[in-house]
Structures are given as structure tokens and as C-alpha cells.
């Protein structure tokens, strides 16, 4: 018998009327979209945390709930005061016990996130340099019905390694009381502690059955093995497009247009007189930046093209950069929408990210449309993107790691250039107003939207919700508490009859780290 269907008023999609409980996450690998553990591999200062954070930002932006579990943060929570590289020596038995506990604590939180908290991907950010360690993580994934995907960052260029240490590691809490030279010397000795036991991934022999990608020399070469599914292929594609070369991305809206003056949304109107002044001011601004080989991108709508024409530079038109399609509400004012389509107006106020205009788009649709633009932006060096308000919000949310809930309310005023400069683990933004007046098109979040997520949304939809949850503080004993409470080494596994666990945490089962 055919299932009864009902249409989601917010997303305008058909869903079955089914009040049965959703499928348990433990069905894992039997499902195409089962949770995945991404396992980072590599020596310190090889960019693992950079890749982890950047990849997590991308996956959350496209709607795949993802979270990083950095074992170093768990270790810093356990060991309140870092002394020296001696903590990482393989013959330091007490420290080894604490490091194992930290890894176990992180894996417990990985399990909780993927099995109970609605997460889809967990990034296990640690060195994981031995085959034995990786085998245990793989066993943990299989036992919990998670897929495992390994990302190894390999770099033998001493200049790149030294640059990574100077840019990121010396500012780490581990070295807050050290000068640069002392921090560099200690960290190089820390790397040496790992090098003796480092076993790289070997897809030709020992690791031929693993799903993995090796990123070699900061993206100069890649080695990919046994990609299992669509999301892993997207991860591979993303990693092959990013680079670490210094560059600047400029984002701005078109100059004020006639519809902006009238308070109308969408359409394809030309620039107002003030919009033309902004185009001239933008041309002068670009000249002052003195950028070599600046690329200029616009949408296919008149206002962005007129703005770009004033620059007297070559520009490329992207259909993907067109403004959000308002469907039946195109070229209406918000007051006209409220009077003509009161229910649609109320639904959009309630959930602006997921709301889809009748015969039009939602912000969620817009993110999917803009993914090729993000990929190409990651490949480029200096770029100026002239676009529209909703489009600019989506792009800015990606670079600033904003959640789906925040995205539709980001302030992107007319006649202002946003200068984005990538830094170690994020992006620095500078807002530059070009001193040309304009109307304000920003609308604050309504009180209804502030009350919480839309109860009509389904958590098991095809595109999962983004996960704005912050990383939990590691729940482990301090180093001092550990030394005082135990003198025996942790067992090399967790059999059911030996319930070794951290206080206040559930057991992982049989899987553990060594």
C-alpha cells in the first residue's frame, strides 16, 4: 500500500507520514550514509590540525554535521603544565599512560557524537603514527558500525616544517612561557620522539584495504586508495583543491540598484546613481590595492556586471553567483509578500535558512549551488567577487565558519568591501566602507526565529543539519590525579571482563588504543 505523504511547508518537499521511531544509528554500514571517522595520520607540524579544521568547516557548511576531536586538547586538559619534549619520549611510561587515556577519552566522545548526538563525521586529530594504533582505531570503527577514512599528511621539506612550527606551534599553550628559539628547539625534539616509531600508510602492501588519501608536500602530490562512498569522494576532491599560498579574497555586493531603493527583492534592475558612484569608488580601491593578476567574478545579473564594468578589468560571469531565487515573491517588497502570502512570510521568518520560496530557492539550496564557487575560490590566489546579499552571506559563512542558523543574518552592507586573509586556522576579515551612501537592506532576526529550531524539520533528512555545537571540554583526570591513582600500565585492549575506563565515561567495548 502506498505511504501517505505530507508536504513540508518550510522546505516544499514531500515526506512520508510516519510516526515510527527513526532507524537506529547502530545500523551503520548497512546504510549508504553511515557515520564516518576521519583518522588523521602524520608527524607533528605536518598540517594535520590545519586540514582537520578546514575540512570540518567545509563539511559543516555543505550540511554534513562534523566535529574535530583533537587529542592534543585532551592532553592539555589532563596535563595542566607542559614541561618539555620528555613527555613524548617512548620510554616515559607514566606519560604514555596519560596519552593513552587521552586518546581513549577522545574516542569515547567520538562514539557519543556519532551514535547519540546526530553527528555524521568525526575527525580524530592525532599523530596515529604506528600501524598498531591505526589498527585499534579501525577496530573501534568496525565495532561501532562506523566507516573509517585515513588522511595522512607527509612533508619532508624542512622549510615548510619550520614555517608550520613558527606560525602555529610556538603560540601553543605548551610554550606560553618560552621564547621562539626555546619553543622551536623543544618542538623539533618532540618530533624526533615520534620519528623512530613512525610507520607511514602503505597502500601497496600493509594498508591496501584501507580507505585513505596521502597528501604529499602540501598538496604537490596525492595518493588515493579505496574510496568507499560519495562523502569520501567529496573529501578527496576538496583536499585536492585547497592550497596554502598567501592570497587575499575580496567580497562585495553590487552597487545600490533601483530595486534596493524600492525595497524589492530579486529581479534584475540596474544601478542607481549612488550605485554608479560606488562602482567608481571600487575601481579606485582596486587600483590602490595594487594586486597582481587579480581575478574578478560577477553574477549574470545586470547590477554586478555594471559594477564590474567600471573596474576596466577582465571579469568572468558565474550563473552560480546569481541572487537567491525568490520564486513567486520575485520583485515584491516584504510588505507585499506579507499581505499577499502571509503564511509564506511567517514560515520564512520562522526558519530563514531552510525556508524555500514557492517555485524558488532556500539558503540551503543556495549553499549547494555555490559549492563549485567555493572549490574554485580555494584554488585561486587574489580574487574579487561581486555578488548579491544572500550569496555573500553564504560565502562569508564558509570562510568565517558560521552555522546554518547564523548565515541568513550575517551583515553584508552595500558599498562595503570585505577583505579576507587566510591565516593559520581560519580567516581574518576586514570591513572597508567606500564612503558612498546607500539604503540598508539588512533585516534582523525575528522573535519567532530566536525561539529555536523549526519543529517541522526532520533530523533524518537527506541533507543533515549543520552542527553548531562547540567542542566539549575533555572529561579526563589530570596527570597528577592519574599518577596518584594508578601505578599499572593500561591494558592493550578492553575485554569485557576488564572494565578499564575513565571516571564518568561509558566503555568503548573491546576497542582501544595502545
From Swiss-Prot:
Signal peptide: none annotated. Beta-D-fructose 2,6-bisphosphate binds at residues 253, 260, 266, 334, 348, 352, 363, 389, 393. CDD domains: HP_PGM_like (cd07067). InterPro entries: 6Pfruct_kin, 6Phosfructo_kin, His_Pase_superF_clade-1, His_PPase_superfam, P-loop_NTPase, PG/BPGM_mutase_AS. The active site is at 125, 155, 254 (tele-phosphohistidine intermediate), 323 (proton donor/acceptor). The keyword Kinase applies. Beta-D-fructose 6-phosphate binds at residues 75, 99, 127, 133, 169, 190, 194. It holds the Pfam family 6PF2K. Gene3D superfamilies: P-loop containing nucleotide triphosphate hydrolases (3.40.50.300), Phosphoglycerate mutase-like (3.40.50.1240). Residues 246-514 are annotated as: Fructose-2,6-bisphosphatase. The keyword Nucleotide-binding applies. Phosphorylation by AMPK stimulates activity. In the C-terminal section; belongs to the phosphoglycerate mutase family. Catalyzes both the synthesis and degradation of fructose 2,6-bisphosphate. This is 6-phosphofructo-2-kinase/fructose-2,6-bisphosphatase 3. It comes from Pongo abelii.
Amino acid at each position: 500500500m502506498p505511504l501517505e505523504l505530507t508536504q513540508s511547508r518550510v522546505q516544499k518537499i514531500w515526506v512520508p507520514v510516519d510516526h515510527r521511531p527513526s532507524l537506529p544509528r547502530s545500523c551503520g554500514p548497512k546504510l549508504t550514509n553511515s557515520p564516518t571517522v576521519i583518522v588523521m595520520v602524520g608527524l607533528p607540524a605536518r598540517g594535520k590540525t590545519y586540514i582537520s579544521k578546514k575540512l570540518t568547516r567545509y563539511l559543516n557548511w555543505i550540511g554534513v554535521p562534523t566535529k574535530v576531536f583533537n587529542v592534543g586538547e585532551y592532553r592539555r586538559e589532563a596535563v595542566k603544565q607542559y614541561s618539555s619534549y620528555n613527555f613524548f619520549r617512548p620510554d616515559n611510561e607514566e606519560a604514555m599512560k596519560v596519552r593513552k587515556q587521552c586518546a581513549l577519552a577522545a574516542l569515547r566522545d567520538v562514539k557519543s557524537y556519532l551514535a547519540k548526538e546526530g553527528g555524521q563525521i568525526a575527525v580524530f586529530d592525532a599523530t596515529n603514527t604506528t600501524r598498531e594504533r591505526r589498527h585499534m582505531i579501525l577496530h573501534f570503527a568496525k565495532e561501532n558500525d562506523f566507516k573509517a577514512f585515513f588522511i595522512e599528511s607527509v612533508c619532508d621539506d624542512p622549510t615548510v616544517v619550520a614555517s608550520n612550527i613558527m606560525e602555529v606551534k610556538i603560540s601553543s599553550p605548551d610554550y606560553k612561557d618560552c621564547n621562539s628559539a626555546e619553543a622551536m628547539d623543544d618542538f623539533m625534539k618532540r618530533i624526533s620522539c615520534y620519528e623512530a616509531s613512525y610507520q607511514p600508510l602503505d597502500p601497496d602492501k600493509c594498508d591496501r584495504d584501507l580507505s585513505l588519501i596521502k597528501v604529499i608536500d602540501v598538496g604537490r602530490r596525492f595518493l588515493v586508495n579505496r574510496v568507499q562512498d560519495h562523502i569520501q569522494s567529496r573529501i578527496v576532491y576538496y583536499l585536492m583543491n585547497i592550497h596554502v599560498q598567501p592570497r587575499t579574497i575580496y567580497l562585495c555586493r553590487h552597487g545600490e540598484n533601483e530595486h534596493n531603493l524600492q525595497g524589492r527583492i530579486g529581479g534584475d534592475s540596474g544601478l542607481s546613481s549612488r550605485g554608479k558612484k560606488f562602482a567608481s569608488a571600487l575601481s579606485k580601491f582596486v587600483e590602490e590595492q595594487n594586486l597582481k593578476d587579480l581575478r574578478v567574478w560577477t553574477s549574470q545579473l545586470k547590477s554586478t556586471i555594471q559594477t564590474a564594468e567600471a573596474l576596466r578589468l577582465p571579469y568572468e560571469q558565474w550563473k552560480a553567483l546569481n541572487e537567491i531565487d525568490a520564486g513567486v515573491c520575485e520583485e515584491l517588497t516584504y510588505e507585499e509578500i506579507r499581505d499577499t502570502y502571509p503564511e509564506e512570510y511567517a514560515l520564512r521568518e520562522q526558519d530563514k535558512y531552510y525556508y524555500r520560496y514557492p517555485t524558488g530557492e532556500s539558503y540551503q539550496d543556495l549553499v549547494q549551488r555555490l559549492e563549485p564557487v567555493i572549490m574554485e575560490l580555494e584554488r585561486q590566489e587574489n580574487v574579487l567577487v561581486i555578488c548579491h546579499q544572500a550569496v555573500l552571506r553564504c560565502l562569508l559563512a564558509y570562510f568565517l565558519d558560521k552555522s546554518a542558523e547564523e548565515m541568513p543574518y550575517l551583515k553584508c552592507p552595500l558599498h562595503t568591501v570585505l577583505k579576507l586573509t587566510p591565516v593559520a586556522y581560519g580567516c581574518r576579515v576586514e570591513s572597508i566602507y567606500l564612503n558612498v551612501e546607500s539604503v540598508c537592506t539588512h533585516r534582523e532576526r525575528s522573535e519567532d526565529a530566536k525561539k529555536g529550531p523549526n519543529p517541522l524539520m526532520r533530523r533524518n533528512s537527506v541533507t543533515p543539519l549543520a552542527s553548531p555545537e562547540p567542542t566539549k571540554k575533555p572529561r579526563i583526570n589530570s596527570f597528577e590525579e592519574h599518577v596518584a591513582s594508578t601505578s599499572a600500565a593500561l591494558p592493550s585492549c578492553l575485554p569485557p571482563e576488564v572494565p578499564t575506563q575513565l571516571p564518568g565515561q561509558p566503555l568503548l567495548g573491546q576497542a582501544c588504543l595502545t
